[in-house]
Amino acid sequence: CTDKYAEVRDIYFPYVGLENHIGGHFSHRVGAYVDGQLNWFTHSNWRIDSNFQDSALAGETLAQNGALGVKIKLNDSVYNEKNIFLREVTVTNDSDRARTVKIFFNHEFEIYESHRGDTAYFDPIHHAVIHYNGKRVFLINGVSDHGGFDDYTTGIFKIEGKEGSFKDAEDGLLAKNLIEHGPSDSVLGFYLNLAPHESKTFYYWIAVAESIKEARDLNAYVLERRPGHLVRSTRDYWHAWVNKYDFNFYGLKKEEISLF
């Protein structure tokens, strides 16, 4: 689940409620770097509104930053057939001039609910970042109109006086550190060249599995089927599930019905 800043706070696998591989106290940050300034979603410059999509088990977040002149819309869902968390990300340049907007995703895992023994590394063959510990594997990837993610790094956090790899994004460039062991984290960057008031959409996902091979197979599945198709099919599935019975709500208000 995500919090009020659209940060993923809980990832349960292999069961709902067991095990939590973020623990609720670490962060999967989202931020934007524009014109030499980085604002994570926790920054006071952001105005963030989150909701559920109507008749769908999917989250929708609109984040607006007047200081940066950027708007970001996130549509979040878990694919209904496989263990894949999907994010459809639409970025709008609200400025009157063309700019490069960089979107960063930071990942702090506590795999097996233990702050030791984890590994994070960049897989150059599949162009993905993988976090793993034993039979718990988290493959992170994404795709935009010009290919995969543009930048990456791995590191360690909350140990040896290091805050975490999210600090590496502050200058708008990542160190491309290939691998780390221990309490490891990572950052992915997507770089968008946007004309004045232009919007572009890209996709980001986390495939969760019990082996690296299985995670790579899930990643190949997303690329083959296209992430946009998976987002739409998941929305359609839940819409059909919610509406398979014709309920009589006996005059309840629309807001009350939507809670149901």
Model-derived segments and spans:
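An extended acidic
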Residues: 1-66, 133, 138-167, 232-258
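Short alpha-helical segments and helix-capping/turn motifs at coil-helix boundaries
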Residues: 13-17, 45-46, 85-88, 186-193
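Solvent-exposed loop and beta-edge segments used for protein-protein assembly and interaction
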Residues: 22, 53-55, 66, 79-83, ...
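Predominantly extracellular/luminal cell-surface or secreted proteins
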Residues: 33-35, 104-108, 205-209
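Polysaccharide-binding surfaces and accessory modules of carbohydrate-active proteins
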Residues: 49, 62-64, 68-173, 186-188, ...
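Short Pro-Gly-centered flexible turn/kink motifs
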Residues: 50, 99-101, 192-211
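Short acidic, Pro/Gly- and aromatic-enriched capping/linker segments at domain boundaries
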Residues: 174-194
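Generic recognition of stable, solvent-exposed alpha-helical segments in well-folded globular domains
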Residues: 183-185, 189, 199, 255-259
